[in-house]
Amino acid sequence: MPKAVRITHGNLWANIESMCAAADLRAGRDVMVSWLPLFHDMGMVGFLTLPMCRGIESVCVTPADFLSRPLLWLELVSRYGGTCTAAPNFAYALAARVLARADGLDLSSLRFALNGAEPIDVSAVQGFLAAGERFGLPPTAVVCAYGMAEATLGVSFHPWGTPLQVDVLDAVALETDRRARPADPGAPAGSVRTFPVLGPPLAGIEVQVRDPQGAALAEGGVGVLHLRGDSVTELYLSVDGPRPTRDADGWLDTGDLGYLSGGRVVVCGRVKDVIIMGGRNIHPTDIERVALQVEGVRAGNAVAVRYVPAGRRESFAVGVESREAGDPAAVRRIEDGVRSAVTAEMGVRPALVAVLPVGTLPKTPSGKLQRSAAAALLDRLTAPN
C-alpha cells in the first residue's frame, strides 16, 4: 500500500544543515548541476530546496534531457563550472561510456559528485574517474553516499576530497556468518565481495546495526541499519491514517543491510532483496555484476531476483537486456554465458535466465531499476498460459 513520509520543517532544516556541512557547500562559490527528477527526494531536497535555502546557484534540466543525451550532464558541468552534482550509480557507468567519445570538456571544477539512491558498483565509480581524467576531473570527485526519504535525504557521505575507500570482504564470512571480515590478499574474485566505505553518520544522526533478534551488533557485524536523529521522520501517512516509523527509543528500521567500520557506514543491500540459498545470504547486486560482464548483455541492464519454481526450493532468476534478443542463437549463447559465469563466480546456479529486448526491464523516470517490478515481470514471463 502506498505511503507518504511526513517531513517536518525541523526534519528538513536539520538535514539541509548537516548536508551543507558535510559537503562544505557555500553560496557564491558553489554551482550545483542536476538532471534529477524533482518528485524524488534527491532532486527535490538536494537540488531544489537546499540551494534555495542557502542561496546557491543551481543549473537544472529534466531526466528526459539527460536520458536522451547523457553527455549534456557533463557539458553543463563544463559550461557553468559546476562544483556539485549527484546521480544514481547507473548514470556514472553511462557517463564513463559517453566521455570516452567526448572532446573539449573541462571537469576540473567538479569537487563533489554524489553517487547514491541505488547500490553502488565500485567499478562504475572507478570507470567514471578514469574516463574523466583527461578532462581534468579530480580523482576524489565521486562521493559515495547513503540516504533515504525517512531521513529527509542524507544519512552518510564519504568524506569529500578524499580517495574512494573500498572494503574487500571474504564472501563466506559475509554470506554465511554475517561478518565483515577482510578477504585474504590475492583471493580469487569469486570469493570476495567489495563495498564502498562511506563516512560517519551526518551530524545529528545516529546509526545502529542490529541482528535479526534486534540486538545491537559490534563493528563488523552485518545486520539491519537503524537510524535516530533530528532529520528522521516520526510518521508515515497512509490511507489508513498516520503510522509511527520509530520504536520506543526513537530508532527507525531502514530495511537496509550493512555494518560499521571505524565508525563509518557500509551498506550491503536490502533485506527484502537478499537471496537465501544453502544457508548463504546472497546480494543480488553481486549476481548482476557478474551477468553484466557477459558479451551481448546491455550495460547497466541486468537484474537478479528471488524465484521459486513450482514445487522447488527458493532460487533466483536473472533477467538481462540485449540488442540481440531477437536472434535465437544469440539468446541461447547469452543465456548459457550468464548461467556459466554466475555459477562459476558465485557458486550458485540460476533457475532461470531471461534475455529480454531493450527497454523491457522496468525503471523509474530517472532510469533506476525497479527490482520488485522486474521480479513480477519475470514471474509473468514464466507463468503457464
Where are these regions (language model features)?
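Alpha-helical scaffold elements adjacent to nucleotide-binding pockets in ATP/GTP-utilizing enzyme cores
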Residues: 11, 15, 47, 72-76, ...
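AMP-binding/adenylate-forming catalytic core of the ANL superfamily
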Residues: 78, 85, 229, 234-235, ...
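Conserved AMP-binding A3 loop
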Residues: 1-14
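Gly/Ser/Thr-rich phosphate-binding loop
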Residues: 82-86, 98-191, 206, 213-215
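Conserved AMP-binding/adenylation subdomain of ANL enzymes
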Residues: 13-31, 41-83, 98-102
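Conserved C-terminal "lid"/linker of ANL adenylate-forming enzymes
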Residues: 275, 301, 305-306, 317-318, ...
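Conserved ATP-binding/catalytic segment of the ANL
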Residues: 195-208, 212-220, 224-284
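Phosphate-coordination loops involved in phosphoryl transfer and adenosine-cofactor binding
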Residues: 28-29, 110, 222
